[in-house]
Amino acid sequence: AGFQHTCGITNSPTNSEPFGGALMCWGFNQKGQAKPPAGTFIQVSCGMFHSCALSIDEHIKCWGAQGIGASPEGEFLQVSCGNFHTCAILKDGHLKCWGKNYDNQVTDAPTDGNFVQVTSGKTHNCAIKKDGSLHCWGSNNRGEIQHPQGYQFIQVSASQWHHTCGITVDHELLCWGADGFGQCSDVPEGMQFTMVSTGRKYSCGILANGTSTCWGQKIQNYGMDQPPGNNTWAQISAGYMHNCGITNEGDSLCWGQDTGGQSS
């Protein structure tokens, strides 16, 4: 889920590949961000006005706003779109970032390797190494890169505003940075999490039992506080003011702001 568009991968492999699928995007398309390329893809990420996806042959294809959405050379493991920049992990474990560089979120990327996950936010990024160590860089206007010390992380998510959340190896959820709407201080306590996704000024997470909860900003009845129904979830993606998730039954559901059809 991005600013006002959403992309996903169908569960029907193309070109007789054993996994992966075709891309589908919906919502606002003023820069072409919701018009994906053809092919078989295994991962997709949405930014403000661009999107990028990892193909089954380990190449990245980006579309949308020119320059911001340029497709890089090389073979990759994962890609993450920020608001106006993108970071990805090369097959050798090194990081590559490109796009707008307002707060050195592109040029200050660590130059060593062994990274296994990267996340890009408004103007900051965080990445996890194989040993669970967390590294963040870029904007620190609200403390969004001042992560807690002494923890090993298994997953991290940088928001489209100024906060970050991560899950430790003990499945504890930690958040830091901007907290004007409780997006860090209202984190559910005493619960184990398997996944977290940060929106603009809110976050959503999947609990160990498969249920999900959201916390932080609740505005204009966009419904960002709780996912719909009594579902268990395989994945959730928080956007600017909307969310989409995949249930354990394989259904795709979206909720929140729908001004451009990004939730419908």
What are these regions (language model features)?
Residues 24-38, 63-74, 84, 98-111, ...:
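Short glycine/serine- and acidic-residue-enriched loop/turn motifs that recur at repeat junctions
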